[in-house]
Design a protein with these regions (language model features):
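Immediate flanking context of iron-sulfur cluster ligation sites
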Residues: 2-20, 55-97, 114
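Long, low-complexity, compositionally biased intrinsically disordered regions
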Residues: 2-22, 111, 124-126, 130, ...
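Short runs of predominantly hydrophobic/aromatic residues within well-ordered alpha helices
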Residues: 17, 21, 161, 165, ...
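General secretory precursor processing signal
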Residues: 18, 23, 27-28, 79, ...
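Internal, well-ordered alpha/beta segment that forms a basic, Gly-enriched binding/recognition surface
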Residues: 83, 90-183
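Hydrophobic, aromatic-lined core segments that form the binding pocket/scaffold
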Residues: 175-363
């Protein structure tokens, strides 16, 4: 019998449906899984005809999956004027495509279990993620449907990474200024990468290896330099952008970088009572992305992704504060979900951010 691990807030999630300002049926190409597609072929009547006409078939040449055709306004054709799903209304929730049932939930499978989470791109999920206080808490349950399929070696390697991630969680939530915390996380990640490499490739240690500049450099000082932030924002602006509000946010921040850097400490002092939100974001990004190191052995890069992601959101918070005089709770949710929507659901984007070398920008 395997396990399922979930953040403690997971069970509190409820889709807010038509009250959502960022409907997940608008602006996203929604794939239709094979089981749902087979069922939709059997639906009778006018609705069945309209349902099938709304689906673009899979294309073997391009590798594109079957998906709902978006209309001219990039809405799912089965989203009615009240922003309610007609599949749900006509056929029931259990007949929705798998991705529609799951979103914003995501799943990561391991040799003897599974981890579930909620994506930050959803405003209802972002509300829960930002609201947490204290150390991260998780619910772990045994599950009949999750079998133990891995070898002993695979499980051992996973447990090493789980232990490393637990140490990072602790650092992310300790009572310390954000920059000090980021520097500790970066140094810890560098040490963890070396430990992980030694585990995979147990060559004799070079006792004469000198300490490098990177070992003693401050990640935060390097990140909050104008040259680093300019390079980073240019990278983000070069990604495929889904919605214009994201481009507007990035270009606005880029135009005011000197002021953002100069006033950042004032912002952090003014919003000291919400410092835990950045702890929660660090924890969220570590939980969601760190264990992907099983696939590429890039432990340090996964921590880099969490650091850059959280710091970019903070950068945009400072810009919002300068532009509007405050960062409302709703504005914070909007910034978080925009970042997640634009970055986390494109593997090329996350890989490039994970590989973005902050310390190299100092050279």
């Amino acid at each position: 019998m395997g396990y399922i691990r979930r953040p403690a807030y997971y069970k509190a999630f409820r889709c807010i449906g038509s009250d959502c300002t960022e409907n997940c049926c608008i602006g996203w190409e929604i794939d239709v899984d094979e089981d749902s597609l087979a069922y939709y072929e059997t639906v009778p009547g006018d609705f069945g005809e309209r349902l099938r006409a709304s689906i673009a078939p899979a294309d073997a040449q391009t590798g594109e999956s079957a998906h709902f055709r978006l209309d001219a306004e990039e809405r799912c054709p089965l989203l009615n004027d009240c922003n309610l799903c007609e599949v749900l209304l006509h056929l029931g929730e259990d007949k929705m495509a798998q991705i529609c049932t799951d979103h914003p939930r995501y799943y990561e499978w391991f040799s003897d279990g599974r981890e579930d989470g909620l994506g930050l791109c959803c405003e209802a999920a972002a509300e829960l993620i930002l609201a947490q206080t204290g150390a991260p808490a998780f619910d772990v349950t045994e599950a009949d449907g999750v079998s133990e399929t891995g070898t002993e070696a695979e499980t051992e390697l996973e447990n090493v990474l789980f232990s490393m991630r637990d140490a990072l969680f602790w650092l992310a939530c300790e009572d310390a200024p954000f920059d000090d915390k980021a520097d500790r996380l970066y140094r810890t990640a560098k040490a963890q990468q070396e430990q992980y490499d030694d585990l995979l490739f147990p060559f004799p240690e070079d006792e004469d290896a000198d300490e490098t500049d990177e070992d003693t450099a401050s990640w935060s000082q390097a990140f909050w330099r104008e040259s680093t932030l300019t390079s980073l924002l240019e990278l983000l602006l070069g990604f495929e952008i889904n919605k214009d509000d994201w481009r507007t946010l990035l270009t606005g921040a880029k135009a005011r970088l000197p002021e953002i850097i100069a006033r950042r400490n004032d912002f952090l002092q003014a919003y000291q009572g919400k410092r835990h939100e950045y702890d929660n974001l660090l924890t969220y990004f570590l939980y969601r992305h760190f264990m992907k190191a099983l696939g590429d052995d890039a432990v340090q890069d996964k921590v880099q992704l969490a650091l850059v992601s959280t710091a970019v959101i903070q950068l945009l918070d400072v810009y919002e504060w300068l532009a509007k005089g405050e960062v409302t709770h709703w504005a914070q949710i909007c910034i978080c979900k925009a970042y997640s929507r634009e970055i986390e659901y494109n593997e090329d984007n996350t890989e490039q951010l994970a590989a973005f070398s902050v310390l190299d920008e100092m050279e």
